[in-house]
């Protein structure tokens, strides 16, 4: 499958499979992060889930999807190496670890950590990665501001930023996909507004 077709399918899944369950989750007081696990062979959805922190603060969108995936009967659950992992938002440190420990060799995401902070008013992904993992240089006692927050390609997995993938396409494919991303930006802006209105009222530690 060519890159444009892959991206189109991933946007389909966000719009048709993840966003509807996320809308219900946000209505209950959860954050707007969601995820899906697809078969690499035909890009069919195995599970699509959303954040469920009002039940357990560890049930971020990705972690909740992983939980549901491993609850499937073994004969209905594909091997993780045969799966594509899709997150609406760039995974936080918890979810990066969950993806790694679960054995997935990839993940794709639409919104970046910076988007989570700047567009959705949820700054904890960057804050925690910097506070917990960014060890200062012994010589200076500081951390370089240009230091990456994590290794986006490593021995366990390779990450894929969908917006950057679109930017690398030729114009004939790019314009339609950019328009679809704009629509998803609007959709998630509405979800964010709904979450922010009730934020802090459901007992989520880092709301």
What are the residue ranges of the model-derived segments?
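Glycine-biased flexible loop/turn sites that connect beta-strands or occur in inter-domain linkers
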Residues: 42-43
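Local cysteine-cluster metal-coordination motifs and their immediate loop/turn environment
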Residues: 86-105
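Short beta->alpha transition motifs characteristic of CBS
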Residues: 47-53
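Short beta-strand scaffold segments in enzyme catalytic cores
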Residues: 33-39
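Short, flexible loop/turn motifs enriched in small residues
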Residues: 28-32
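A short, polar/charged loop-to-alpha-helix boundary motif
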Residues: 53-67
């Amino acid at each position: 499958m060519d890159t444009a077709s892959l991206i189109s399918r991933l946007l389909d899944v966000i719009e048709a499979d993840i966003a509807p369950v996320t809308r219900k989750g946000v209505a209950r007081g959860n954050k707007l992060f969601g995820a899906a696990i697809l078969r690499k062979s035909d890009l069919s959805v195995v599970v699509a889930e959303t954040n469920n922190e009002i039940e357990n603060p560890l049930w971020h969108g990705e972690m909740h999807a992983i939980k549901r995936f491993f609850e499937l009967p073994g004969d209905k659950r594909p091997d993780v190496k045969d799966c594509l992992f899709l997150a609406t938002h760039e995974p936080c440190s918890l979810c990066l670890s969950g993806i790694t420990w679960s054995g997935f060799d990839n993940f794709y995401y639409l919104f970046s950590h910076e988007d989570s902070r700047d567009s959705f008013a949820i700054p904890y992904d960057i804050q925690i990665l910097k506070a917990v993992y960014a060890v200062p240089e012994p010589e200076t006692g500081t951390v370089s501001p240009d230091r990456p927050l994590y290794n986006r390609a490593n021995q366990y997995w390779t990450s894929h930023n969908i917006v950057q993938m679109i930017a690398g396409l030729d114009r004939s494919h790019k314009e339609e996909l950019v328009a679809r991303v704009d629509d998803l930006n609007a959709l998630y802006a509405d979800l964010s507004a709904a979450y922010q209105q009730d934020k802090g009222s459901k007992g989520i530690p880092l709301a």
